[in-house]
């Protein structure tokens, strides 16, 4: 294979059978349970990278069911998103996500810089409530419950919330172990079609784990819970801050 062939085909590894396809990445009937809670502000400051700023000491704990996604297939994801501001623009910073499917792990890390790790999350209706769980190995590190469709939410308002900016810290090492890429990336969810949004009573329990430290941001108070179903496209990102150029 000639160098020009390598350049023309280079998108993802392995070269001859990439771990994930080119986009666009469309999700149909993507289901979210988002439990917002108040936590320790000092612990938040210790994990949120500047120039992002914390507005309130809140965390969105998310369970996401994605049964129909372009190129990525059928999978479930769980993790923590922190409300932040960047140059006065409100958005969400993804601290860590845990999922059970290799293509979105590889694609998420390599394309956008999603901090994804392999684990075993679930999300399903359990009689009269929605149950979300996250197991890392044999340890249950997160359990979330929410009353099933107790009260409808305004779809336009929820769509605006989903359409806001999201931020990631993309890190790719050089072959010598030093940082080759260290960037703050911004991306958006696009072409959103809302199919339903509800709220209700919720609970969230987090347990300590050395390699899935969701409990490092402790639950002090449940502030809000949302159950959302939507079709959407995961837009590609843009670099807003290069740490290596500073």
UniProtKB/Swiss-Prot annotation:
Active site, UniProt feature: 116
Highest taxon above the source species: Bacteria
EC number: 4.1.1.4
Name the UniProt record assigns to this protein: Acetoacetate decarboxylase
Species of provenance: Burkholderia vietnamiensis (strain G4 / LMG 22486) (Burkholderia cepacia (strain R1808))
Keywords: Decarboxylase, Lyase, Schiff base
Family: Belongs to the ADC family.
InterPro entries: Acetoacetate_decarboxylase (IPR010451), Acetoacetate_decarboxylase_bac (IPR023653), ADC_dom_sf (IPR023375)
Reactions listed under catalytic activity: acetoacetate + H(+) = acetone + CO2
Function: Catalyzes the conversion of acetoacetate to acetone and carbon dioxide.
Any GO molecular function: acetoacetate decarboxylase activity
Gene3D superfamilies in the cross-refs: Acetoacetate decarboxylase-like
